[in-house]
């Protein structure tokens, strides 16, 4: 323990990380630097400063990372139309590499020997934090208290906090029965009744979205302007990336968009049920595919779709800073050069419906695609040779007596 003199802790100010703070001070006899990230989770982060100071912390970092989060992590991910296991929009996963990056930056700034986090030994986040940290600073020491201590229940954490004078709320406002994580992209719910995969989630669990049944009876129309694959304006009003996502969360939430209840495969081997609200992200995914549908070459679009599951898996499992993810990102970004234009959407009772798309870079040619007289733009007789050449290998196989049965 003597080799650790200063540790940077990813600190929320909640029970777990407050206990970790004290545990680090006592177990390692070290100085602790706290880092609290504002990723748009909708909670006040300033109380973490007062709590850390009360626990003897001299160096306290509270960083507003909302713009960086959306600009450098969420937007690049959505250029790939990223979805994990067909449904999950990776709201938790995509936040972890930014936190890891900032932990390492602060460790370098403060001369810390180690970093620490509050992720448990049963989840994905420990992997995401630590893979990111090692990629950015190979020799860094990582302290993961949940893999070391014997405080394996909430009651034990509460008892430890009371014993060491850590401010807690044992009584007071009702605590959510769920384990929750939020940022500007989503809010997640795990644990509690959700651990029974047959039990329906309770309606009052959802924080961001109206139920589709109770959403407005009149649809909402919005127009999203794209530049190189990123949304830059809503209804003609220029916005920053964080402003875009904030507004889409608002209008999507009102219309009951973005709820999800899934069982996913964790990287550490177990299956886990999670419920997610991702109103803005759900809208972004639908709209981005719509603008790509008229601006991307067919084979480029198909290749992107083939590679997307691998890209999604890299994010989910913590390999954001890996060479393979960076390589894929260069390809994805190159594909977005002509992904410009406007998408018009109708939002109604949990549904996102594309009702229009236009672009100066559109590859859609109405003169060729029309069902009416095309004035010779497309010679239908050419199709006969095209079909015969593509059928050649199957005709040869059939002539050899090969069958599909």
Swiss-Prot record:
CDD domains assigned: ASS
Residues that bind L-aspartate: 120, 124-125
Residues engaged in binding ATP: 10-18, 37, 118
Any single Pfam family the record assigns to this protein: Arginosuc_synth
Principal location class: cytoplasm
Assembly with partners or alone: Homotetramer.
Protein's UniProt name: Argininosuccinate synthase
Gene name in the database record: argG
């Amino acid at each position: 323990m003597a080799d650790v003199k200063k540790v940077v802790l990813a600190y929320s100010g909640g029970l777990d990380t407050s206990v970790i703070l004290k545990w680090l001070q006592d177990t390692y006899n070290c100085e602790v630097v706290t880092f609290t990230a504002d990723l748009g989770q909708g909670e006040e982060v300033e109380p973490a400063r007062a709590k850390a100071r009360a626990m003897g912390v001299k160096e306290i970092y509270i960083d507003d990372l909302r713009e960086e989060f959306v600009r450098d992590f969420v937007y690049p991910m959505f250029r790939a139309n990223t979805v994990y296991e067909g449904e999950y929009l990776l709201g938790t996963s995509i936040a972890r590499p930014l936190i890891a990056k900032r932990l390492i930056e602060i460790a370098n700034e403060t001369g810390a020997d180690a970093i620490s986090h509050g992720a448990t030994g049963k989840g994905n986040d420990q992997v995401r934090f630590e893979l990111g940290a090692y990629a950015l600073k190979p020799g860094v020491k990582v302290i993961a208290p949940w893999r070391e201590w014997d405080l394996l229940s909430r009651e034990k954490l509460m008892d430890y906090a009371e014993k060491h004078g850590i401010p807690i709320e044992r009584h007071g406002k009702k605590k959510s029965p769920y384990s929750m994580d939020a940022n500007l992209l989503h809010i997640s719910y795990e644990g509690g009744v959700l651990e029974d995969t047959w039990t329906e989630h309770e309606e009052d669990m959802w924080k961001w979205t109206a139920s589709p049944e109770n959403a407005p009876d009149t649809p909402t129309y919005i127009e999203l302007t794209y530049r190189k694959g990123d949304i830059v304006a809503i209804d003609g009003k220029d916005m920053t990336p964080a402003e875009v996502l904030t507004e889409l969360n608002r209008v999507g939430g009102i219309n009951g968009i973005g709820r999800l209840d899934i069982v996913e495969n964790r990287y550490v081997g177990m299956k886990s049920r999670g419920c997610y609200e991702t109103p803005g992200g759900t809208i972004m995914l639908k709209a981005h595919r719509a603008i790509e549908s008229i601006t991307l070459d067919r084979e480029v679009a198909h290749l992107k779709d083939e590679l997307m599951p691998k890209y999604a898996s890299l994010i989910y499992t913590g390999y954001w800073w890996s060479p393979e993810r960076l390589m894929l990102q260069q390809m994805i970004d190159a594909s977005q050069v002509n992904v410009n234009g406007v998408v018009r959407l109708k939002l109604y009772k949990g549904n996102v419906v594309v009702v229009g798309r236009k672009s100066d870079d559109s590859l859609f040619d109405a003169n060729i695609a029309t069902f009416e007289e095309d004035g010779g733009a497309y010679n239908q007789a050419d199709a006969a040779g095209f079909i015969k050449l593509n059928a050649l290998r199957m005709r040869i196989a059939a002539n050899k007596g090969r069958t599909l049965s």
